[in-house]
Amino acid sequence: YKSDKLDDWKRFADRLNAVAEKLSRCGVRTGYHSHAHDHQPVEGQIPWEIVAENTDPRVILQLDTGNCMCGGADPYAVLTKYAGRNQSIHLKPYSKAAGYEPAIGEDDIPWEKVLSWSENEGRTEWFIVEYEMDKAPVSAIEKSIRYLRTLRPL
């Protein structure tokens, strides 16, 4: 979702709540995946925070670590602000110098902090490794998995 109006974001949160209510009756969970623009101010407020603070706790906040950092936010700080809402996280690398090009472990995201908190306090159930670039994606995913295995046995 994207809008440059605060009221639109609040209406979007209302729509997420309505969908979550309907789908929860069927045993289906609803969530929102973050984009870079979700972490950039709209009328002085951060859209990700508007969504988080105006949705039912059963709405999953699926943080994308790379998009979060690209948008100017600290993925670790964003995760810890909304404990219990990040049942799944997209582990996407991002470097301020090289953008989305580096593999996980060659970027600027504090992976040890992100993983440790997510596993222990965050109640994260799924970690999805994602690579944004077309440049050698298989090689980048292999490097990313190797690095993640140095932090945690998979």
Language-model features, listed with the residues they occupy:
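Active-site acidic/histidine proton-transfer and metal-coordination neighborhood
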Residues: 1-60
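Histidine-acidic metal/acid-base catalytic patches
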Residues: 42-60, 67-154
